[in-house]
Amino acid sequence: SCYEIEIDDCQIVIDTGTGFHNVELVRKKKDTVIIYSHFHHDHIQGLSFNKYLYDDFSPILISSALCNANTLKEILETYYSGHYFPIDLFNQLKHLKIVEFNEINKLLEGKIKLSSTKLRHPGGACGYRFEKNGASIVTLFDNEYHDDQKQDLIEFCEGADLVVWDGM
């Protein structure tokens, strides 16, 4: 799973699954942010396979509404360490900055409104809503719908121009 939203001077990538290798990171021209819906293999495995990570060392901010920055750092550094991956990605690519989710909102302030909601998925997951100039996109990845979510999801998605929802 990997989706990209480009708005004005900001590039937002949601999850870095296998499709991430096709994303042209344009961070010399735009602020680049990666946010994760959750941390299952199919949503993080492509991070190291994007060639643009290795040719420009402008900062890329990485975050998730699902957990704090320390937990996210622990998850990604464990996955991309010498134990499970042939290179220690975060020690080699110092421009990958793991930050608290509120730091992403500060960066995006005035550019795009970003909000999140908790989803049902083993290990947890969160959905995101992106709003700008009256238009909105909602992403709900791997949500395992249950009736007790109905009202919250109706409110979170209300008025959205596009809802991307895949479920199990």
PLM region descriptions:
Residues E144-M168:
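Cap/insert and terminal regions of metallo-dependent hydrolase folds
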Residues L140-D142:
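DG-centered beta-turn motif at the end of beta-strands
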Residues S1-V138:
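Binuclear metal-dependent hydrolase catalytic cores
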